[in-house]
Amino acid sequence: MTKTIIDQAGATPGAIRTREGLVSAYRTELAIAGAIVLLVLAVGTQVPQAMSWGNFANITQAGAPLIIMSLGVLLVVITGGIDLSVGSVFSLTGMVTAQAMASGLDVSAALIGLGVGLVFGSINGFLVTVAGLAPFVVTLITFAVAGSLAFIVTNGRSMPIGDPDFWLLNSGSLIPGVPNYILFCIVLLVVIEIFLKKMVAGRWFYAVGSSAAAARLLGIPVKRTQFFAYVASSLLASFSGLLTISYILNAESTAGSSLMLQAIAAVVIGGASLLGGTGTAVGAVLGALMITVIQNGVNLIGINSFWQGSVTGLAILIAVLIDRFSKSRRGAV
């Protein structure tokens, strides 16, 4: 009985995939992939440069930080929570790492940067699971605190990265011919997708998001699952920040100001519900790629960049309406 309820908590659990097939299980993700292709083709008719390999490389390079951050946000959203602090954690990580390197540390300063994510993720998890505060309130507070600290570290000044070897974290190649930023995205995608869909602990995330009370009755460690989700979200936000500063070799206190909205948008566009209980890593990655393609297209066509926020907001609205419509149809059936 326990396994049945946990299986029902996920949108496309393993048993359903086996029965209906891979295409049926990932039909939402396939639709998003198709939409991305259509977007690229549409922009390509206006700007042939959009179809070049160089532009595709730019899209993956620009999208990697958002992809990684979105995978972390996905874990929280599946459990029925929300993490508004990821953009500020992203910024603070960059500032702290840059300051540590300016103080004489080598690339090992990246560990201090990851420590920022660990600390803020633990604070979020503790306040949500132990103190019982609402995720929106908790992460709004840590969003403000981390954002403020990002300014305080250097009095709002940007910080250059003094060690050029730090660039290798992003653009080096642990595997010949494959840039690290692509490798990291692929590895995280595979690991998180397998964790969510094939491991018992991953199924707990869906169960908690579907009904925390029911999950608790089944003996699922609800608080531990939620705590892990917030820690993972902040750690991935920090890692995303490290990848960014290692590419541009500069840290800015406002670098992640727009990424929080984009990460949540990517998760929702990818098929996750803000009510919890559904979502896939594949969907989150495709959602992030769609946002990046839209931004890239806006720039290539020459549309005012200030419209990007409006386009992102519209994409969220459409995704939420589609999610609501699909749920109402399933309820009617």
Curated annotation (Swiss-Prot):
<keyword id="KW-0813">Transport</keyword>
<dbReference type="GO" id="GO:0022857">
    <property type="term" value="F:transmembrane transporter activity"/>
</dbReference>
<feature type="transmembrane region" description="Helical">
    <location>
        <begin position="84"/>
        <end position="104"/>
    </location>
</feature>
<keyword id="KW-0614">Plasmid</keyword>
<feature type="transmembrane region" description="Helical">
    <location>
        <begin position="175"/>
        <end position="195"/>
    </location>
</feature>
<feature type="transmembrane region" description="Helical">
    <location>
        <begin position="62"/>
        <end position="82"/>
    </location>
</feature>
<feature type="transmembrane region" description="Helical">
    <location>
        <begin position="133"/>
        <end position="153"/>
    </location>
</feature>
<comment type="function">
    <text>Probably part of the binding-protein-dependent transport system y4mIJK. This system probably transports a sugar. Probably responsible for the translocation of the substrate across the membrane.</text>
</comment>
<comment type="similarity">
    <text>Belongs to the binding-protein-dependent transport system permease family. AraH/RbsC subfamily.</text>
</comment>
<dbReference type="GO" id="GO:0005886">
    <property type="term" value="C:plasma membrane"/>
</dbReference>
<keyword id="KW-0472">Membrane</keyword>
<dbReference type="Pfam" id="PF02653">
    <property type="entry name" value="BPD_transp_2"/>
</dbReference>
<keyword id="KW-1003">Cell membrane</keyword>
<protein>
    <recommendedName>
        <fullName>Probable ABC transporter permease protein y4mJ</fullName>
    </recommendedName>
</protein>
<keyword id="KW-1133">Transmembrane helix</keyword>
<feature type="transmembrane region" description="Helical">
    <location>
        <begin position="110"/>
        <end position="130"/>
    </location>
</feature>
<feature type="transmembrane region" description="Helical">
    <location>
        <begin position="274"/>
        <end position="294"/>
    </location>
</feature>
<keyword id="KW-0997">Cell inner membrane</keyword>
<feature type="transmembrane region" description="Helical">
    <location>
        <begin position="300"/>
        <end position="320"/>
    </location>
</feature>
<dbReference type="InterPro" id="IPR001851">
    <property type="entry name" value="ABC_transp_permease"/>
</dbReference>
<feature type="transmembrane region" description="Helical">
    <location>
        <begin position="228"/>
        <end position="248"/>
    </location>
</feature>
<feature type="transmembrane region" description="Helical">
    <location>
        <begin position="253"/>
        <end position="273"/>
    </location>
</feature>
<feature type="transmembrane region" description="Helical">
    <location>
        <begin position="30"/>
        <end position="50"/>
    </location>
</feature>
<keyword id="KW-0762">Sugar transport</keyword>
<keyword id="KW-0812">Transmembrane</keyword>
